[in-house]
């Protein structure tokens, strides 16, 4: 169904909002200022920051987004096609939730696919699929995506799926996973994508919570050196769970054995697609849930973030040019997993809404086949901008410190590298700049927000050479402030709670699935009138945010609040350590003292005792004796989630001899046993 009201005006990079306007940002000194780590008290927030640090267009946009959010986002929404105009741009009828584009109707699949074809862009490449684990490469045009998505929508409708029903997608990093997401969106079904290979128990919990009418899955996932059978994992999840979906739609991966189908329950993807009728887009209200995304490490009642359709479409389309500085048609690569929020926002919806080509990569930064993989993909596909996690960069650096494998590739089209997902230490940042030879920009956001909270908005003229260690300035719409526990605003460089003054902008979550009480309690009760990010950090005088750690990771040393992230950065800057996690170890005298778990670089010749002595001295010089840092242990590897995060709370429990739970998102759970052995010998 084609919208009849406000037809989309193609974003060409010259619109009033979202236009790339590079400006002339001032170049900042490369020196790393000593961190202000002990909490202080004063007052500062994004609203007050209008210093002369470059990016006049950014300042205008940010000020407008705070002063008149309805007008600001109403303008941005004109870049999206609507079936029915909204009656109110913003409404706070049910605080703390904010409704955007009230009573407006749209379809995000239409905006991501159909409208580009209607504008004559059907032959443009929508998806580049690059799978080193299967030695497969494919380019898929917008027309080809539409053909697959509209037929798959027809398959779902034939099985009784209708607007408001839920569908679980349990698939690897293949185009069919994106088709499934868009097909659900096309008919107004709510998808819940759970990354392939997720353990049966946790998969069962999510299926029971979301109660899907259909589960869409694949026969296998492929990891380096091994094949992951999805059906046994899914069968076990359904066996131990309460909810039984009506149908399983199974995609058998080519050149692999077919999985047997259960008569009356299972459907073969290819067979159903061959006889399917294409289905048109179904209009939905702006507040209609597009998807449910469960946050990693969920315990107790599942925490399923609900994403409203209209605001998400507006925000993602706006960010592609305003934050990432891209023009339609350019190639974009978010090196993440579709099962995480980055995959939802910036592998699937964001680039397609904006008319970009999105790279879908089924591989790893190293091991598929080597540490030159990222360079190959960037060169081969003419990628303009890459978004990855710092842990991926560290993995490349650890295996190839001089980036020798990357030197054979020409990166002539590559303009910018964005990192997020965890703090990017200065050492990793500087190495990335050196080997990729482009600006490397850290930015910060959360599953709940769906898009960046702070960033270097290069499309709005922000500096491409911000100070090391920062995570950008407030994205328009996000009025970030630093508060102490008594809701007092803190002065610049004082460590405190990072909060966002309400209302949240379009695209942020509208609730937790079947758990609105937890939504209110977790995020809005501690600081009334604000969204509690549960992260700790500080702002400098120029308005740059430094995200230091989760609030729970602030270590209380003899009454002083010390950021674990700051100590980690100091350890990494010494040059002998390639990865580090700092946790608080209980101490009878000081309450807690920091303990560093370190992974040494391959080329370090000194003994562990010598390295420890040097690191302790280095941390004392860069942070001061207040950190009380005296101990570290050396391990072969740190545990990481699939999105590259270190499970610090689990490590903290382990270090302190307490029971701990290994979440199903951990890539290699055996690392915990190794760390336990190291700690027994060292402490």
UniProtKB/Swiss-Prot annotation:
ATP binds at residues 421-423, 442-447, 535, 550, 561. CoA binds at residues 223-226, 620. Its main location: mitochondrion. Pfam families: ACAS_N (PF16177), AMP-binding (PF00501), AMP-binding_C (PF13193). It is an enzyme of class 6 (ligase). Induction: Expression is up-regulated by fasting. It is found in: Mitochondrion matrix. It comes from the Eukaryota. Belongs to the ATP-dependent AMP-binding enzyme family. Catalyzes the synthesis of acetyl-CoA from short-chain fatty acids. Propionate is the preferred substrate but can also utilize acetate and butyrate with a much lower affinity. PANTHER family: ACYL-COA SYNTHETASE (PTHR43347), ACYL-COA SYNTHETASE SHORT-CHAIN FAMILY MEMBER 3, MITOCHONDRIAL (PTHR43347:SF3). This is Acyl-CoA synthetase short-chain family member 3, mitochondrial. It comes from Rattus norvegicus (Rat). The lineage of its organism: Eukaryota, Metazoa, Chordata, Craniata, Vertebrata.
């Amino acid at each position: 169904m084609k919208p009849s009201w406000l037809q989309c005006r193609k974003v060409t990079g010259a619109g009033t909002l979202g236009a790339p306007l590079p400006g002339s940002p001032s170049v900042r000194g490369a020196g790393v200022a000593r961190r202000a780590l002990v909490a202080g008290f004063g007052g500062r927030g994004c609203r007050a920051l209008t210093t002369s640090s470059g990016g006049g267009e950014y300042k205008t946009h940010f000020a407008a987004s705070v002063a008149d959010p309805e007008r600001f986002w109403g303008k941005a929404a004109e870049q999206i096609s609507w079936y029915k105009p909204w009656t109110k741009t913003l409404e706070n009828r049910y605080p703390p939730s904010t409704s955007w584009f009230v009573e407006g109707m749209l379809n995000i699949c239409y905006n991501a696919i159909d409208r580009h074809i209607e504008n004559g862009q059907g032959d443009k490449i929508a998806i580049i699929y690059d799978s080193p684990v299967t030695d497969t490469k494919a380019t898929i045009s917008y027309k080809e995506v539409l053909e697959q998505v509209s037929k798959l929508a027809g398959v779902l409708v034939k099985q009784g799926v209708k607007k408001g029903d839920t569908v679980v997608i349990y698939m690897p990093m293949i185009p069919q996973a994106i088709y499934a997401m868009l097909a659900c969106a096309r008919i107004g079904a709510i998808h819940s994508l759970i990354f392939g290979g997720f353990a049966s128990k946790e998969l069962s919990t999510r299926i029971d919570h979301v109660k899907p009418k259909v589960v869409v899955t694949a026969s296998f996932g492929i990891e380096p050196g091994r094949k992951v059978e999805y059906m046994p994992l899914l069968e076990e999840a359904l066996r131990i769970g309460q909810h039984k979906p009506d149908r399983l739609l199974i995609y058998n991966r080519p050149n692999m054995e077919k999985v047997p189908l259960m008569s009356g329950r299972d459907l073969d993807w290819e067979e159903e697609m061959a006889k399917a009728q294409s289905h048109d887009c179904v209009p939905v209200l702006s507040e209609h849930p597009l998807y449910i995304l469960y946050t990693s490490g969920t315990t107790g009642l599942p925490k399923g973030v609900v994403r409203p359709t209209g605001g998400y479409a507006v925000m993602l389309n706006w960010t592609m040019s305003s934050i990432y500085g891209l023009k339609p048609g350019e190639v974009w690569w978010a090196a993440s997993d579709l099962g995480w929020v980055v995959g939802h926002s910036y592998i699937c919806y964001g680039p397609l809404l904006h008319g970009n080509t999105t790279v879908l990569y089924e591989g790893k930064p190293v091991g598929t086949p080597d540490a030159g993989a990222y360079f190959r993909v960037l060169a081969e596909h003419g990628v303009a901008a890459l978004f990855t996690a710092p842990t991926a960069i560290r993995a490349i650096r650890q295996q190839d410190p001089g980036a020798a494998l990357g030197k054979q590739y020409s990166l002539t089209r590559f303009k910018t590298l964005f990192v997020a997902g965890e703090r990017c230490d200065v050492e990793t940042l500087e190495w990335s700049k050196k080997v990729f030879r482009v600006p490397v920009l850290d930015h910060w956001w959360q599953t709940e927000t769906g898009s960046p909270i702070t960033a270097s908005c290069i499309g709005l003229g922000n500096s491409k050479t911000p100070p090391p260690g920062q995570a950008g300035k407030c994205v328009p719409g996000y009025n970030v402030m630093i508060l102490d526990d008594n809701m007092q605003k803190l002065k610049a460089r004082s460590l405190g709670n990072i909060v966002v003054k309400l209302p949240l902008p379009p695209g942020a979550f509208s609730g937790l699935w079947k758990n609105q009480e937890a939504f209110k309690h977790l995020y809005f009760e501690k600081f009334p009138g604000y969204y509690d990010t549960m992260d700790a950090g500080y702002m400098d005088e120029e308005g740059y945010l430094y995200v230091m750690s989760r609030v729970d990771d602030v270590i209380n040393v003899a009454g002083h609040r010390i950021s674990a992230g700051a100590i980690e950065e100091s350890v990494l800057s010494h040059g002998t350590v390639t990865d580090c996690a700092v946790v608080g170890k209980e101490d009878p005298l000081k309450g807690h003292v920091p303990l560093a778990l370190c992974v040494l670089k391959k080329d370090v010749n000194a003994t562990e005792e010598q390295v420890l002595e040097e690191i302790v001295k280095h941390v004392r010089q860069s942070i001061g004796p207040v950190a009380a840092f005296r101990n570290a242990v050396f391990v072969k590897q740190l545990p990481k989630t699939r999105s590259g995060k270190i499970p610090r709370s689990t490590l903290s429990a382990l270090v302190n001899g307490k029971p701990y739970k290994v979440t199903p998102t951990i890539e290699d759970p055996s690392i915990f046993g190794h760390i336990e052995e190291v700690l027994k010998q060292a402490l």
